[in-house]
Amino acid sequence: MEEPLGSPPAALSALEKNVAELTVMDVYDIASLVGHEFERVIDQHGCEAIARLMPKVVRVLEILEVLVSRHHVAPELDELRLELDRLRVERMDRIEKERKHQKELELVEDVWRGEAQDLLSQIAQLQEENKQLMTNLNHKDVGFSEEELQKHEGMSERERQVMKRLKEVVDKQRDEIRAKDRELVLKNEDVEALQQQQTRLMKINHDLRHRVTVVEAQGKALIEQKVELEADLQTKEQEMGSLRAELGKLRERLQGEHSQNGEEEEAEIPPQPDGEESISDAEKAALDLKDPNRPRFTLQELRDVLHERNELKSKVFLLQEELAYYKSEEIEEENRIPQPPPITHPRTSPQPESGIKRLFSFFSRDKRRLANTQRPTHIHESFGQWAITHRDDGYTEQGQEALQHL
């Protein structure tokens, strides 16, 4: 069985690929191959043979396109969700550790306060005893013996040692409290740094989602543009084939008219070489339709306009996303709530017209044009007028298609 004319070899390689490796471009190649097969069946058996089958095939290809696009987007979204969950778990762990550390500091402070209170009470008691001893010493009139003096000096020395030991304990606890305060300050700085890092990672996550959305939109626009250009190219090739067929018919009719008229036409019509030159000029005028860079609206200009339109659309989309991002930042700064923003799931926008339907609509339009061009036409004007008229019609039709694309 012969391969259909103009079918891309990429469609055959797409059919041989693994299911997990399919992309949206492979789905479009498969759709193109199926469309060519439908076209050949229509040529052989008519449109009624596949009138009920074609909508079902189109629906199956659309479902395949959606599944393939979801398969390529889902892993990246899962990775981002896992990263966000991990950051949240880390933040909760840090908060829990900070609470435990705060409780430990409070316990240490309570113990220190209790010990300091005990020491202060002991100091007050010793001072009171010292005062009592001093008063007793002043009121006594009898002299102390040497043994009593040594005993009193021993008691005062012991009190000094107790006071010195108490002072050392207080200084040691004060140093420990200062060290704990410094450690608490360092922990707070670490917590603030981790919060800043979390905020930065959340911004990076938001930017990555934004870039993924922009790249998906640009990819879809490029795929649709490729499908439209391929369909336009096939349409132009079919139009050129029909024009060549009509040109051959006109040549045969002109030769028949020349042979029937005979000598009368030889007197009225210029010599044969000039006729051949006029026919060649008409052929050149008709064949000029093949030139992609012919005047008025060329295919290259159409591509430039479509490319510029897609760039402007992507720039507008980027500006809208940046404006929404800055507005959300201003709202967050006004509210000043230190909590991570909730996960925003993008709303499911209404499904645009699938590239599969657009591709099959081009095939049906090509069929209608071929059916219209194959009908017999009656020519009442000369060959030059016919060529000029069809050239203007071609320019008009090309301009209308360009306006539709724009």
UniProtKB/Swiss-Prot annotation:
The UniProt keywords, alphabetically, are:
Cell projection, Cilium, Coiled coil, Cytoplasm, Cytoskeleton, Phosphoprotein, Protein transport, S-nitrosylation, Transport
- Pfam families of this UniProt entry? RH1, RILP
Residue span, RH1 domain: 10-97
One GO cellular component assignment for this chain's record is:
membrane
Task: List localization entries.
Answer: Cytoplasm, Cytosol; Cytoplasm, Cytoskeleton, Microtubule organizing center, Centrosome, Centriole; Cytoplasm, Cytoskeleton, Cilium basal body
- PTMs? S-nitrosylation is required for the interaction with GAPDH.
Q: Which residues carry this modification: Phosphoserine?
A: S7, S259
Annotated region (Disordered) at: 255-280, 330-354
Q: Quick one: where is this thing mainly located?
A: cytoplasm
Q: Which residues form a coiled coil?
A: 76-258
- One of the protein's GO biological processes: cilium assembly
Give all residue intervals belonging to the RH2 domain.
294-359
Residues where S-nitrosocysteine is found:
C47
InterPro entries tied to this protein: DZIP_RILPL, RH1, RH2, RILP_dimer
Report biased composition (Acidic residues) as residue ranges.
Answer: 262-280
GO MF term (any one): protein dimerization activity
Q: In which tissues is it expressed?
A: Highly expressed in heart, skeletal muscle, brain and lung (at protein level).
- Subunit structure as annotated in this protein's UniProt entry: Interacts (when S-nitrosylated) with GAPDH. Interacts with RAB8A; interaction is dependent on the phosphorylation of 'Thr-72' of RAB8A. Interacts with RAB10 and RAB12; the interaction is dependent on the phosphorylation of 'Thr-73' of RAB10, and 'Ser-105' of RAB12.
Q: What does this protein do?
A: Plays a role in the regulation of cell shape and polarity. Plays a role in cellular protein transport, including protein transport away from primary cilia. Neuroprotective protein, which acts by sequestring GAPDH in the cytosol and prevent the apoptotic function of GAPDH in the nucleus. Competes with SIAH1 for binding GAPDH. Does not regulate lysosomal morphology and distribution. Binds to RAB10 following LRRK2-mediated RAB10 phosphorylation which leads to inhibition of ciliogenesis.
- What family classification does the UniProt entry report for this protein? Belongs to the RILPL family.
Protein name per its UniProtKB record: RILP-like protein 1
**Species name for this entry?**
Rattus norvegicus (Rat)
